[in-house]
């Protein structure tokens, strides 16, 4: 049969990235509490395309993922990228896995147990040299406004905020390490299951630890700078203001120099 993809391109221009998007895939990831957990990923995967070729071979991306059934980590992602490069005769390969990561969390007063989910993204790129990886996490927290607390006779406005972290690492770290440091930066973590005793505890504890988005982003950045395996990070905190019709945000980006 005629191989149209390998025919000459009408416009001889190289393509930076071409492939498939939004492919659903069952996935196993490492879990600090249980060793591993099963989740579902949405995958984007692609390669570069030289100027002389009309198109890529889309089916080969799906074949690569169908033949890949490993636990997701940096080493297995590297093997997947190498396989894609070889199948497509490409110089560069790229993959993005988006998935919910679940942590079972006990409520602070009653220890009632519930699963909290965190949106995660792992991106890998491989060219001629070493692969590069980027881990992204979204961690919800609660914040209480210090200004509102200072000027109000009763109470203060509070809201949910999200800590978004993008991290490049030099070694293995548990996802929970970054979840923990983000939650510690806010006024309080958030929970799935809370009884009345828990709600009382969370409300009073958060009120005792008021934080601006500026406080949260600085606290998270300080902890990321001190992490032994973090080489670069970007952290953004977005607060979904309860008494305003807009959101507040703050962000910090740093390259971490060790030693």
From Swiss-Prot:
Example GO molecular function: GTP cyclohydrolase I activity
Main function: Converts GTP to 7,8-dihydroneopterin triphosphate.
Any matching Pfam family: GCHY-1
UniProt keyword annotations, A-Z: Hydrolase
PANTHER family registered for this protein in UniProt: GTP CYCLOHYDROLASE MPTA
Enzymatic reactions: GTP + H2O = 7,8-dihydroneopterin 3'-triphosphate + formate + H(+)
Annotated site location: May be catalytically important: 145
The name this protein goes by in its record: GTP cyclohydrolase FolE2
NCBIfam families given in the database record: PRK13674.1-1
Top EC class for this record: hydrolase
Known EC number: 3.5.4.16
GN (gene name): folE2
Record InterPro entries: GTP_cyclohydrolase_FolE2, GTP_cyclohydrolase_FolE2/MptA
A GO BP annotation: tetrahydrofolate biosynthetic process
Keyword check for DNA damage: no
Presence of the UniProt keyword Hydrolase in the record: yes
Pathway the protein takes part in: Cofactor biosynthesis; 7,8-dihydroneopterin triphosphate biosynthesis; 7,8-dihydroneopterin triphosphate from GTP: step 1/1
Entry similarity comment: Belongs to the GTP cyclohydrolase IV family.
